[in-house]
Amino acid sequence: MKLKETLNLGKTSFPMRAGLPNKEPIWQKEWEEAKVYQRRQELNQGKPHFTLHDGPPYANGNIHVGHAMNKISKDIIVRSKSMSGFYAPFIPGWDTHGLPIEQVLAKQGVKRKELDRAEYLKMCRDYALSQVDKQREDFKRLGVSADWENPYVTLTPDYEAAQIRVFGEMAKKGYIYQGAKPVYWSWSSESALAEAEIEYHDLVSTSLYYANKVKDGKGVLDTDTYIVVWTTTPFTVTASRGLTVGADIEYVLVKPAGETRKFIVASELLNSLSEKFAWEEVEVLNTYRGDELNQIVTEHPWDSEVDELVILGEHVTTDSGTGIVHTAPGFGEDDYNVGVANGLEVVVTVNERGIMMENAGPDFAGKFYDKVAPIVMEKLGDLLLAKEEISHSYPFDWRTKKPIIWRAVPQWFASVSKFRQEILDEIEKVKFHSEWGKVRLYNMIRDRGDWVISRQRAWGVPLPIFYAEDRTPIMTEETIEHVAKLFEEHGSVIWWERDAKDLLPEGFTHPGSPNGEFTKENDIMDVWFDSGSSWNGVVVNRPELTYPADLYLEGSDQYRGWFNSSLITSVANHGVAPYKQLLSQGFALDGKGEKMSKSLGNTIAPSDVEKQFGAEILRLWVTSVDTSNDVRISMDILSQVSESYRKIRNTLRFLIANTSDFNPTTDAVAFEDLRSVDQYMTIRFNQLVKNIRDAYENFEFLTIYKSLVNFINVELSAFYLDFAKDVVYIESAKSLERRQMQTVFYDILVKITKLLTPILPHTAEEIWSYLEFENEDYVQLSELPEAEDFANQDALLEKWNAFMDFRGKAQKALEEARNEKVIGKSLEAHLTIYPDAEVKELLESLNTNLAQLLIVSALTIAEGDVPESAVRFQGVSFTVERAEGEVCDRCRRIDPTTKERSYNATICNHCASIIEENFAEVVAEGFEV
């Protein structure tokens, strides 16, 4: 036998190298076969419910790192709730209708207009479901625990029927109406868009300053006067029917030198406009308030058959332009509102593909709207005063990345204005985890217009509206419920397979159809109405979930998207918000803080991370950043996270190895019988348990990460485990001192493994497989530990916190001695302490081997004068010398009692007593040399 074999060196086959890319799929397969998710739900039956409702990602393409961050975050929350006494099933979902899938099929050569509608929709459906299957595997590979066999998908018959019923309730309450209001129109998608489908980019546009000649000045202005207007959309001049001024804005009538014409502009803008138009010696002839100009008639710049009326509008400002806005009610929301209020004609001169129509005039017809500025300038002639190229923020179609226009077309709307206050009141009742999120959603609802819910596309849920022979829309409770039942049985494709009459209840009649003939709506619903109905299609309809949901968690872009549409439909139907709490996340940026894009080549695919590091590292990264804001990710950042993971893993490996001969049933020591330092570590660990439990409760992942890493690196590795080796390795295997420390080790190991499970389920499960005395076969089926309180813990903490301050000073003294070559490592030191009365009392009260705690070979507490050479601190001073004696071959301490023993071992008296007591045969025969 060798001397080394008398040490209690930890034994474990738990590997230092995690091998996550290979091991994770093995664990996931085992969990699936063992039905761990289902067993967790069964265990929690009858407990309080917690419903985190999954916002559905769009079923197209592989998941990106933003998807991964979001789904991992949800998984951490749901797992922590499941392990905290809540019944928390998680139903993943997918959004499956909409233009992107139509675009994919178009790129594959599918020509929608040449196919039967039902055949085309089947192709869309098949593609969408293939993407659901692909993404499901992507999410499962992240270790997300969910009801993967029973997800919700917005194209299933039950979901479509639930969506129709949401629409039906809104129709019954009078919230659905048809109008020809201007809407965001995407010529590239040939469809109306909702606000959530708009993104803003900088765009360079041609802006024109031109003048309308006064035709009837109403006794205020002469007919040789011209009203100057500004436009950034020259094509809309073809549909201009009025000029809008601000009632309280001051306008001036001016005559520049050398001009026969007089002009009206806003007084505040005269100087800048004079410079722009090269006007000199401008004479101000008169001033007017805007309301004095109301109802003056001007000529259209080139269309002699059109008059343009001066009207008042609150949207007019003097921030830019001329203080007068040309008004085309067919091409803008403000224009429409003031135009209709003043009886202006609503004219639309651009078709669905962005092409100018015949009513724009022969010079414009057939041309693309964005290419007609030169023609407009030519038509204006000397009415054109200036032209500028301006860069401004402009709305784009978020899918095609092309600019959009406002365009008035017949559309179906949800009247948000009718119940806006009810929505705002509900927002006040929601718990937001960021105050700015509440303000953002509140302001969006407060300021938004009515919701255009119709789309001129194919792949989506039909609007369940019929028309009588006289074109009266029909959407009664009876007809809508009948359609819902048909969709429930056959899916929404039946809308396209049957005639209108066959979709109506048998024997249905309507006074507007004396001949019994009916037609049906060809538009589909906005996809935001699809996902915005999920609270009904899923949360209400699934018995295992509770409505309203406890939590919605998505990216911050969903304030204008899913958070918004879900809120509107839920309040419209039931008068309540669909969520009790709202939590939003920022975007994942690259390592430099730049937005990720394929064109820049700076994207990170979750699959690449899984292959190089493992999903655990991606999961740990999610907790290491503040996801409420934009976060950075790169392979370098993930390498740093991987290093944190390695420290966590190896610390827990040390605990596994050094409790391999510990049976908690027979070997554990009661708290009151632990040494003071072991009690201190137990209390500190329970403080960690409380902090982590609180952080899980408040979804504060970063707090968990920081608390955990700090405890492992500072409290455990740098302190407790550092000196623990002198006990667990050196002392007799069954000694009280060793069992005391093992009790603390085992307690920390078991509980920290449970605390880690929501974040690192694969690693936690691997550790759990080495804990033979724990009852649950999977750690996921256990409960998170509760923090314990102990008698006199405050006094104990105060004492040991004071010691930790003292220890820091001692370490500085040892470091100085190292720098001066007095010692090499601390175990070579004899540390002499010169304490004041308070520190002396502290050290004596610890009742612990101070040399062991400070990892020195010898320690003296001295009285009397402090030597000049001492390292001085407030309340204590130190001197450091090399310890006397020889190095013990067993404990490595320098000890005066170290000598060669008769059994071939050069060891100290303490080690000799352990060997002679526990290894009698070796003492008789001698150690191998």
Swiss-Prot record:
Cofactor: Zn(2+)
Chief location of this protein within or outside the cell: cytoplasm
Cofactor note: Binds 1 zinc ion per subunit.
Alphabetical list of PROSITE patterns matching this protein: AA_TRNA_LIGASE_I
GO BP: any one term: isoleucyl-tRNA aminoacylation
Functional summary from the UniProt entry: Catalyzes the attachment of isoleucine to tRNA(Ile). As IleRS can inadvertently accommodate and process structurally similar amino acids such as valine, to avoid such errors it has two additional distinct tRNA(Ile)-dependent editing activities. One activity is designated as 'pretransfer' editing and involves the hydrolysis of activated Val-AMP. The other activity is designated 'posttransfer' editing and involves deacylation of mischarged Val-tRNA(Ile).
Protein family according to the UniProt entry: Belongs to the class-I aminoacyl-tRNA synthetase family. IleS type 1 subfamily.
Identification of the protein by name: Isoleucine--tRNA ligase
Lineage of the species this protein comes from: Bacteria, Bacillati, Bacillota, Bacilli, Lactobacillales
Gene designation: ileS
